[in-house]
């Protein structure tokens, strides 16, 4: 009888603790971040914000989904949950209903929303990180490297605490090239390519790629050249990771762990290392 009583008490303690842990995080969905725009902008320009209620001045990751700039939707990566980090999952307008500049502008507007609003939820504007996978990595590159996009919203891109593009295109995006009648295997670098805007950055910039033999056509090699150009601009806090055995689709599983580790290091005021 005493054993039964003990296990009943233990069971209810576990249930109670699980409930407390669930209450430590809140997720607010479908928050509009663009003040103006047509019906399509009003439909797409929304974000979800997952954040801890038990951490003061928590870091925030603004996360852009992939999908070739023509598909996909906002979500909070499971690997980033329960880490003491706020995560903003962003929807943005897509090709062909929108143009490439509108896609990038939406990404900038979402980051500007973070700078203006995270303190209301307990987050810190000095710990805002930008990241995304594939098309989301491309958007990350563009708004960090070309300062004009965030300047439009009164935000200095150099205020971003760190950037983590996951397998982002750094030459002209393949769907932009496709719209111009070029094949996906015809490389091009113009003013819509992150490579065009390589510069010295004040924040850590971590490039993540899948296995070079499993990635999309030449994607690792793009990252490697991008990394070399960043090094030539004295970006000693620009690191490149290749996820052995991971393809383009599943490489975030490994990449998220690296990102969380580096975010902790940056928030501790230390330099990141491989």
Labelled PLM ranges:
Residues 73-90:
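Short amphipathic alpha-helix adjacent to the substrate-entry channel of hydrolases
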Residues 20-55:
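N-terminal cap/lid segment of alpha/beta-hydrolase-fold proteins
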Residues 57-66:
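Short beta-strand element of the alpha/beta-hydrolase
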Residues 154-162, 167-176, 184-224, 228, ...:
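The feature captures the conserved acid-bearing segment of alpha/beta-hydrolase catalytic domains
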Residues 98-119, 142:
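Alpha/beta-hydrolase active-site loop
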Residues 208, 224, 231-274:
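C-terminal catalytic histidine-bearing segment of alpha/beta-hydrolase fold enzymes
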Residues 115-179, 190:
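Primarily recognizes the serine-hydrolase "nucleophile elbow" in alpha/beta-hydrolase
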């Amino acid at each position: 009888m005493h054993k039964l009583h003990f296990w009943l008490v233990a069971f209810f303690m576990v249930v109670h603790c699980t409930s407390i842990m669930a209450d430590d995080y809140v997720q607010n969905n479908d928050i509009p971040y663009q003040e103006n725009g047509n019906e399509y902008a009003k439909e797409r320009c929304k974000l979800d914000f997952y954040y801890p209620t038990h951490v003061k001045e928590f870091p925030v990751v603004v996360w852009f989904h992939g999908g070739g700039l023509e598909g996909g939707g906002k979500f909070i990566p499971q690997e980033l949950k329960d880490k003491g980090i706020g995560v903003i999952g962003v929807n943005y307008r897509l090709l062909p209903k929108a143009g490439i500049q509108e896609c990038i502008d939406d990404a900038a507007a979402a980051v500007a929303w973070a700078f203006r609003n995270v303190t209301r939820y307990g987050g810190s504007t000095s710990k805002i990180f930008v990241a995304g996978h594939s098309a989301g990595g491309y958007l990350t590159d563009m708004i960090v490297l070309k300062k004009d996009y965030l300047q439009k919203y009164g935000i200095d891109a150099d205020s971003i605490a760190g950037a983590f593009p996951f397998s982002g295109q750094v030459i002209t995006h393949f769907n932009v090239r496709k719209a111009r009648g070029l094949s996906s295997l015809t490389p091009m670098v113009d003013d819509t390519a992150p490579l065009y805007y390589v510069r010295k950055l004040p924040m850590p910039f971590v490039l993540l790629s899948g296995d070079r033999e499993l990635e999309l056509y030449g994607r690792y090699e793009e990252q490697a050249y991008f990394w070399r150009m960043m090094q030539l601009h004295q970006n000693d806090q620009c690191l490149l990771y290749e996820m052995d055995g991971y393809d383009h689709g599943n490489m975030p599983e490994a990449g998220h762990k690296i990102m969380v580790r580096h975010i902790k290091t940056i928030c501790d005021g230390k330099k990141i290392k491989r």
